[in-house]
Amino acid sequence: MRKLSLILMVWLILMPVATVSLLAAGHLGFVSQEEFHWQGEMGVGKTLEIKGINGNIHAELSSNGRAEVLATKHGHRHDSKSVEIRVVEHGNGVTICAVYPSVSGRPNECVAGDGEGMNVHNNDVSVDFAVRLPAGVRFVGRTVNGQVQTSALSGEVAANTVNGNILISTSSYAQGGTVNGSVTASLGSFNWPHSVEFETVNGSITLELPAAASTQFEAETVNGNISTDFPLTVQGKLSPKHISGTIGGGGGRQLLLKTVNGSIELRRAH
């Protein structure tokens, strides 16, 4: 057994980094893992979009001025090779997708923007994305079963999932939503052009804005409370479950925070 373990260790060391498949002790069947790397130049104002189904997405600021993406695929009952990572370059930037096998007859495609949803059935492969962005690049992260998190970005952020938390930190502005999870966001700018929205169904919302924020504000919950650090000029009837009013001068912009089962907290940055 010791000799076999040594042989296995040497084999793993000599394997290319891109693909490693092995039989994991304590698990039934094969566990496979595979990595995908991409990097490229992206200018200020361009968008890097990540689309996944199962797995987490994490984005942070790049230290070398280049955009970099590491996608790590994990398979248990299904081979990680069954999920393809596709890169689509377009006029607005780059979209990178985890493309699962299709079972409905309509092939899954990697399309920029909202596009058509992918159909996935009975495939347990998860793909975790680790992203590094140059300053000023817009980030879009979309998944279904997983968390979307950004750390100290400097561009606009849009983050969406279904089953997972949203955690956003950017010196710009952002918006995001989930269904089963909480939303936590810290924004360094309130100069969004029209409106931004953060929403969930089963989870709380905590949003931090600059002290000088100026916006129309609306917050709504069913089972929870609403609190704000900002002085608020209330419009209409004041309710513990629904608040509509103005922060600062309003600025011609809108901010909507909405949940069903959870509380809402609007914080003022110090």
Annotate the PLM regions.
Residues 1-270:
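Intrinsically disordered, low-complexity terminal regions
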